[in-house]
From Swiss-Prot:
Keywords: Cytoplasm, Ribosome biogenesis. It is found in: Cytoplasm. This is Ribosome maturation factor RimP. One of its GO terms (biological process) is translation. It comes from Moorella thermoacetica (strain ATCC 39073 / JCM 9320).
Length: 158
């Protein structure tokens, strides 16, 4: 995470939490000649268009006041979607039992890509039951990316 995105996160999270929203992810970069700041928000009952509009208004006002971004940009606010990223320790426990894809920074047992059922987070490690039939514990600092995999069977259980 860059210094700028870390600063934006520090400004935005305390604003969203009392409103009942979780900042799932934040992306900032240049695309097609313009800068875009994307916020992905969630809450237990899900996200609708009204939520995105409300968060966009309050975040836009805050960023206009604090002015941490040195040039013009577009602000986009959306749901993380069905295959949301897992970033925080709490995410790995909240979605235990769900199907996930995980990529590590360095190979573990000769591979960097894993898919299976998330068992949770414990003692600094993400635990999962792999599709190959064995369990794996990966230190959180070795996880490059992790995200839910949409599985209709999981959705029907909820």
């Amino acid at each position: 995470m860059s210094k700028l995105t870390a600063l934006i996160q520090e400004l935005v999270e305390p604003l969203l939490t009392p409103m009942g929203y979780e900042l799932v992810d934040l992306q900032y970069g240049r695309e097609g000649g313009r800068y875009i700041l994307r916020l992905f928000i969630d809450r237990p009952e899900g996200i609708g268009l009204d939520d995105c509009e409300q968060v966009s208004r309050v975040v836009s006002a805050l960023l206009d006041e604090k002015d941490p971004i040195p040039h013009s940009y577009y602000l986009e606010v959306s749901s993380p979607g069905l295959e949301r990223p897992l970033k925080k320790e709490a995410d790995f426990n909240r979605f235990a039992g769900r199907k996930v894809k995980l990529r590590t920074f360095a190979p573990i047992n000769g591979q960097r890509h894993f898919q299976g059922r998330l068992l949770g987070y414990q003692d600094g490690q993400v635990r999962m039951h792999l599709e190959e039939g064995w369990d794996l514990a990966i230190p959180l600092e070795q996880v490059a990316t992790a995200r839910l995999v949409f599985d209709l069977a999981d959705d029907e259980e909820d």
